[in-house]
UniProtKB/Swiss-Prot annotation:
Involved in the cell-cell adhesion. Has calcium- and magnesium-independent cell-cell adhesion activity. May have tumor-suppressor activity. GO terms for molecular function: protein phosphatase binding; receptor tyrosine kinase binding; vascular endothelial growth factor receptor 1 binding; vascular endothelial growth factor receptor 2 binding. InterPro entries: CD80_C2-set, Ig-like_dom, Ig-like_dom_sf, Ig-like_fold, Ig_sub, Ig_sub2, Ig_V-set, Neurexin-like. This is Cell adhesion molecule 4. Residues 21-324 are extracellular. The gene is CADM4. N-glycosylated. Residues 124-219, 224-307 form the Ig-like C2-type domain. Monomer and homodimer. It is a single-pass type I membrane protein. One of its GO terms (biological process) is regulation of protein phosphorylation. Residues 346-388 are cytoplasmic. Expressed in brain, prostate, brain, kidney and some other organs.
């Protein structure tokens, strides 16, 4: 077992006073807590010691030291100090079976003793993380984390991208130690493949701020994807073109198939795995080339349209943006501009027509008034004749 640190908490002081002859002598002990494999010091403090016999015994009441002399052949126990003020022994490589009460006995006419209680804690080892079944994109994955031995029972936590995941924990006592397990379940996608999940274990046997961690790398299986990359954008007769089929997938497709539409590949073509080499291009090599890949989760296919130009032809390199998309965007912009222009013309015509109508109406009224003014007398006569 690896080397562990020694831990001591605020200790309960136990006092005993000898009565009768030899009164005034006192023995004081301190409780000790240590991590398994660590070093513990058990101390008996003496007050007004007069040289009486001092005996140190283990929890089984076996004498370890008698007045400073070794009585039990266990080299893990060493006498560090024997003085009128203090008796101190050192225990290395502490074990669970060492736990219990250690007796400091002072023999005068009456026997007096105090007990120093040794508590042994067990730090958790690195957790064991396992997956219940293979993770597939769109499904759920269930992970389990196990710490088979700790004391007190370890606390388990899950982390993903520095965020804590909620797990379900259970514990079982096995003698003096505890076995603790935790499970976590969550949905995964292809982007989660290779992600890190951490299971962390902590208890009081570890130094403050320390923990034991195990990282689990997610293995998420998903259907393949394929894309063809050309060694050059513009090819002319006599050039050599290399097409590369970039494939992803888990499990990775182990076979890639090259085709040219409904025709066979040119005799000069050399297909090796992900690459297709077309040397000495001629116009007869024109066509749609495809690469195909598959795994148990699906199938992928990529297309490349080969156009071989004359050596002296002036052409522009193909862009990565499909012409159909660019054409669609331009058509939409033209349509919007036409709609705006039509709306502006319609509003202008309507406003102008309304203005002309009002203007003509105003002229008619003014003309009638002027005519009435000029022919006022005749009109009056006509009105008189009408009424007569």
């Amino acid at each position: 077992m690896g080397r562990a640190r020694r831990f001591q908490w605020p200790l309960l002081l136990l006092w005993a006073a000898a009565a009768g002859p030899g009164a005034g002598q006192e023995v004081q002990t301190e409780n000790v807590t240590v991590a398994e494999g660590g070093v513990a010091e058990i101390t008996c403090r003496l007050h007004q010691y007069d040289g009486s016999i001092v005996v140190i015994q283990n929890p089984a009441r076996q004498t370890l030291f008698f007045n400073g002399t070794r009585a039990l052949k266990d080299e893990r126990f060493q006498l560090e100090e024997f003085s009128p003020r203090r008796v101190r022994i050192r225990l290395s490589d502490a074990r669970l079976e060492d736990e219990g009460g250690y007796f400091c006995q002072l023999y005068t006419e009456d026997t007096h003793h105090q007990i120093a209680t040794l508590t042994v804690l067990v730090a958790p080892e690195n957790p064991v993380v396992e997956v219940r079944e293979q993770a597939v994109e769109g499904g759920e994955v269930e992970l389990s984390c196990l710490v088979p031995r700790s004391r007190p029972a370890a606390t388990l936590r899950w982390y993903r991208d520095r965020k804590e995941l909620k797990g379900v924990s259970s514990s079982q006592e096995n003698g003096k130690v505890w076995s603790v397990a935790s499970t976590v379940r969550f949905r995964v996608d292809r982007k989660d493949d290779g992600g890190i999940i951490i299971c962390e274990a902590q208890n009081q046997a570890l130094p403050s701020g320390h923990s034991k961690q195990t990282q689990y790398v997610l293995d998420v299986q998903y259907s393949p994807t394929a894309r063809i990359h050309a060694s050059q954008a513009v090819v002319r007769e006599g050039d050599t073109l290399v097409l590369t089929c970039a494939v992803t997938g888990n499990p990775r497709p182990n076979q890639i198939r090259w085709n040219r539409g409904n025709e066979s590949l040119p005799e000069r073509a050399e297909a090796v795995g992900e690459t297709l080499t077309l040397p000495g291009l001629v116009s007869a090599d024109n066509g749609t080339y495809t690469c195909e890949a598959s795994n148990k989760h699906g199938h992928a296919r990529a297309l490349y349209v080969l156009v071989v130009y004359d050596p002296g032809a002036v052409v522009e390199a193909q862009t990565s943006v499909p012409y159909a998309i660019v054409g669609g965007i331009l058509a939409l912009l033209v349509f919007l501009i036409i709609c705006v222009l039509v709306g502006m013309v319609w509003c202008s015509v309507r406003q102008k027509g309304s203005y002309l109508t009002h203007e003509a109406s105003g002229l008619d009224e003014q003309g009638e008034a002027r005519e009435a003014f000029l022919n006022g007398s005749d009109g009056h006569k006509r009105k008189e004749e009408f009424f007569i």
